[in-house]
Amino acid sequence: MKRLHYAWIIVSVTFLILLAVQGVRLSFGAFVEPWERQFSIDRSTISLISTVSFIVYGISQPVIGRLVDKWGARAVLAWSALLTGVSIFLTYLVTSPWQLFLLYGLGVSLGVGGASNVAASVLVVNWFSKKRGLAFGIMEAGFGAGQMLLVPGSLMLIHWFSWKLTVVVLGLLLIVIVFPAALLMLRNNPSEKNTEPIGGLAASEKETAPKTTALSVAGMFRMRQFWFLIFPFLICGFTTVGLMDTHLIPFSHDHGFSTTVTSAAVSLLAGFNIAGILLSGIVADRWSSRKILCILYAVRALSIVILIYSHEPYLLLAFAILFGLVDFATVAPTQMLATQYFQNYSIGLMIGWLSLAHQIGSALGAYVPGVIYTVTGEYTLAFYLSIGMLVLASVMNVMLREPAAVTRDSAAVVDK
């Protein structure tokens, strides 16, 4: 029997880390109403906590990319998971809103920022020369699995017991299970296990060697491809983690849907999110990532149209299925394009900039709809704003050139 390559252990452990850490982050919406009642604060204030969290997360991403280059992805992922666990556990002791800003807005967010796809993506690149799109898909499926398990799980624990017991359970999951698994099982490079990456050593060395280029980082900012990846990914953050992960549960309750229906919708969304992530990763190995992204953003806009008219449970569930299929499915194609367009740059640094853009979008997507809700008493205007932004993101991906053409042009410039 052929022995399982350790690369699959690596991607499985990163899946577990993202499931737990990002699942904690994605569960924020479950705590919105309990915290409103507990601390007598309005929706916009709760949204501001989420916004601060996204800003801290986002600002940390380029720094995390540098830390991964310096200390290795294993250390960054493991200790970040521990920081997230300790911070969410300590929210049990919170007695006023400023403490939530400190523990969740700062502590949890720094931990989540470290245990993100910046460090995890570096592991995938180091361990996979081939089947990289599939590996990215499996890794990113951790987001969907965390959403499917921890968000409805948090909802039910809050419903049956209390939000304080829920944060204790989430904290112990990270401290007792995830942190030891990351520390004991992750390895930064195949050489640490006396093996080669999937696809061969030569290809991996070419991809992961220290990046040297005549172009400055400022030159990267002047590249059209940089901004045409960054801005749609900002819109991605606005419409997924910002808008839906913060406001979908309150929206559902405002429309009179029960906790059972809301949990079913969240679970369906997360389940189809996993399917969409895996499918997009597989397709990204075989087809144009640029065209995939164009389709994904357009379908996401269509799903929000359905949500606007979701006055019956079956429409809410239909939205959940369609939105789930395209939720985090944008990540693998975006990362594939980034590694193809910017081959001369640090992988961790480039993914860090993408993640920063995503978190800026997430921060705006959490706060702006909260303000709109406070002013108008509904989310309709926020949904129409999101639809317009998604159409723009789809068009911007149409306007991108294929990576092969960009690489040929860059090579021609170097030859001259």
From Swiss-Prot:
Membrane topology recorded in Swiss-Prot or TrEMBL: Multi-pass membrane protein
Membrane spanning stretches: 4-24, 45-65, 75-95, 100-120, 141-161, 165-185, 226-246, 264-284, 304-324, 347-367, 380-400
Gene3D superfamilies in the cross-refs: MFS general substrate transporter like domains
Keyword Transport part of the UniProt annotation: yes
Localization (cell): Cell membrane
Gene Ontology cellular-component annotations: plasma membrane
Domain of life per record: Bacteria
Keyword Cytoplasm attributed: no
Keywords: Cell membrane, Membrane, Transmembrane, Transmembrane helix, Transport
UniProt GO molecular function: transmembrane transporter activity
Matching PANTHER family: EG:103B4.3 PROTEIN-RELATED, MONOCARBOXYLATE TRANSPORTER
Family: Belongs to the major facilitator superfamily.
Protein known as: Uncharacterized MFS-type transporter YbfB
Source organism (scientific name): Bacillus subtilis (strain 168)
